A protein has these predicted regions:
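Bacterial N-terminal signal peptides that target proteins for export
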Residues: 1-9
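N-terminal intrinsically disordered, low-complexity, charge/repeat-rich segments that act as generic
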Residues: 2, 21-22
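Compositionally biased alpha-helical segments
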Residues: 22-146
């Protein structure tokens, strides 16, 4: 019986490992450059469909691909999607996660929404307090629709 439990645990671990989200990194200077010169006058309206089939319209920055690097430092262009999650770690090692297409960036702050269901609650992080930026596809069933 213990062999069956061990075998099941190994299989579950392997499934989790193979299906886990791949994390990429955005150097802070690169992040600032990718948003440089953008302001709210450039926002475009998009419509997303959620896992329950619901549709939501909102405005987002017109970024189609995000320049980032993999764990080995190789450059990668990640296609923007509503399921992308961006994780900021500040100088105190506090982590904040936003949906990438629901962030806004100005000269001093990154603002974002942490939930697609309660979009009225926003949070701000000072740009100069950001130590690392990670981005990954959370594999949540959100997609852009025309």
């Amino acid at each position: 019986m213990t062999k069956a439990i061990l075998f099941s645990a190994v299989i579950l671990g392997l499934i989790f490992f193979l299906s886990s989200c791949k994390t990429y990194y955005i150097p802070v200077d690169s992040f600032k450059q990718q948003f440089a010169g953008m302001d709210t006058s450039q926002l475009k309206e998009v419509t997303t469909r959620g896992p329950m089939g619901d549709k939501v319209k909102y405005k987002t920055f017109p970024i189609n691909f995000i320049k980032c690097v993999d764990k080995n430092g190789n450059p990668v262009e990640l296609k923007n999607s509503p399921s992308l999650e961006i994780r900021f770690t500040d100088t105190n090692n506090k982590k904040t996660i936003f949906y990438f297409d629901l962030i806004s960036v100005d000269e001093t702050y990154v603002s974002g929404v942490q939930s697609r269901f309660i979009t009225s609650i926003k949070k701000k992080i000072p740009l100069n307090a950001i130590k690392t930026i990670e981005i990954q596809d959370g594999k949540k069933k959100f997609s852009y629709v025309e």
